[in-house]
């Protein structure tokens, strides 16, 4: 009875918005809510149906009394099957724990990525224009530039391969 009262008090819209659910998770929750509402509605309809059967009317109509007696005996001895739903509840709880763990891991990754992006944005906003940078500052930002330049100079090459093709020859003859 307590579970039924708790199920009636669930605010589905608040769950979706407060947890910030989107995409597949929100769709799954909405599908679950629909199945829950359909099952509750069907249970309500079935509980309102009368369960009494007038066997005397059947006895007066039918000639074969043995069939009516057999059906009445089975009807009175019928007990609805009860199911142990503990296994399903444990599976749902395990799924919930796993989903929460995955959500927290995703939140941690997103927070780290946001911090990294904020740091990158700050660097971009505070960076000096390229034409104001010195050669030493560019080399400090990308150490491989010094290594490549040293290799080219040690081989006696004073121009960068592909530079003239890309930017043209600016030398005045």
Swiss-Prot record:
Protein name per UniProt: ATP synthase subunit d, mitochondrial
A Pfam family that the UniProt record links to this protein: Mt_ATP-synt_D
Gene Ontology CC entries for this record: mitochondrial inner membrane; proton-transporting ATP synthase complex
Keyword Ubl conjugation included in the entry's annotation: no
Chaperone listed as a keyword: no
Superkingdom of this protein's organism: Eukaryota
Membrane topology recorded in Swiss-Prot or TrEMBL: Peripheral membrane protein
Record's subcellular location: Mitochondrion inner membrane
Annotated GO MF terms: proton-transporting ATP synthase activity, rotational mechanism
UniProt record similarity statement: Belongs to the ATPase d subunit family.
Role summary: Mitochondrial membrane ATP synthase (F(1)F(0) ATP synthase or Complex V) produces ATP from ADP in the presence of a proton gradient across the membrane which is generated by electron transport complexes of the respiratory chain. F-type ATPases consist of two structural domains, F(1) - containing the extramembraneous catalytic core, and F(0) - containing the membrane proton channel, linked together by a central stalk and a peripheral stalk. During catalysis, ATP synthesis in the catalytic domain of F(1) is coupled via a rotary mechanism of the central stalk subunits to proton translocation.
PANTHER family attached to this UniProt entry: ATP SYNTHASE SUBUNIT D, MITOCHONDRIAL
């Amino acid at each position: 009875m307590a579970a039924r009262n708790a199920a009636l008090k669930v605010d589905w819209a608040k769950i979706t918005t407060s947890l910030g659910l989107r995409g597949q998770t929100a769709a799954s929750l909405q599908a679950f809510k629909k199945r829950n509402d359909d099952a509750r509605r069907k249970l309500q309809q079935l509980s309102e149906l009368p369960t009494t059967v007038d066997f005397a009317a059947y006895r007066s109509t039918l000639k074969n009394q043995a069939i009516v007696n057999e059906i009445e005996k089975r009807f009175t001895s019928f007990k609805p099957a009860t199911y142990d739903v503990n296994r399903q509840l444990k599976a749902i709880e395990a799924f919930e724990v796993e989903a929460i763990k995955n959500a927290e891991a995703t939140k941690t990754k997103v927070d780290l990525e946001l911090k990294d992006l904020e740091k990158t944005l700050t660097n971009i906003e505070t960076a000096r224009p390229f034409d104001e940078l010195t050669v030493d500052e560019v080399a400090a930002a990308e150490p491989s530039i010094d290594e490549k330049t040293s290799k080219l100079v040690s081989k006696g090459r004073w121009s960068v391969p592909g530079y003239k093709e890309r930017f043209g020859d600016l030398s005045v003859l």
